[in-house]
Amino acid sequence: MKYYSYFPGCSSCRGTGVALGLSTQAITDALELELIELDDWNCCGSTPYVSTDELGSLCIAARNLALAEKTGLDLVTPCTCCYTTLNRANSLLWQYADLKNNVDECLAAAGLEYKGGVRVRHLFEVIYSDVGLKFIESKVINPLSGLRVAAYYGCQLVRPECSFDDPRNPKSLDCLIASLGAEPITFPLKDRCCGSSLVIPELDLALDLIHQLLDSAASHDAQCIVTVCPLCQTNLDAYQDMVKRKFKTRYSLPVLFFTQLIGLALGVEPKALALDKAIVSAQTLLSQFTKVAEPVI
């Protein structure tokens, strides 16, 4: 069993990305991962908040880092936005002494300190690097044979630097998909932005970006899209009908989390994977891959 401090994040805990949180919980035992939820965690600092109050965002992020440092474990999150915000804060506090001094004052007011000893990691990287594809392959009871999948990395997972993949041409998610028996299709826009929170102030612009992604996946014969980010999943799933109306498209592409795809291949109950939470249903597409693993006695 591998142990980690776990930061669920607001979205995957009780927001639009709740299916990510539920499916994460559903696969950890099979992958021999022990995710110990960080006690008294707060919002990561939020990527939009960074642009309006950088110091405030850093202080919020640093509080989580200080709490995680007490555990002595790597801090793991399933949310790409949380991963980016926490990782960025960690990096800035290492690089800029003046900034760290200001943050230290905020932490001291809460009776905390951060020495800089936490390694922030995305759950996908933990599964890819620490669990490993060979181990995952050995656990597959539902090979996803014939399922054509567009691997969507989004714009944050492997940027600006990445220790486990090529930021210019990532392939790790494609490799994971292949290890589950599915077919990763060619997807030229695999690392393009989904529109992020632009759906609020600039909906038309965001819909254009979402349309480009969906159109690229559909034109390369994808049957579904798999992502590592709750914001990407929300945009591609929740706004797909709006894209249909605006651009007169006909495709209907389910958008799944990588944790859901893993769980399906490992024989986890579809209900436990929260497959019913999506707006674009994957039920018909995935009905052939629902053999459930026998309980271990």
Regions found by a protein language model. Name each.
Residues 1-297:
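Iron-sulfur cluster-binding electron-transfer modules in prokaryotic oxidoreductases
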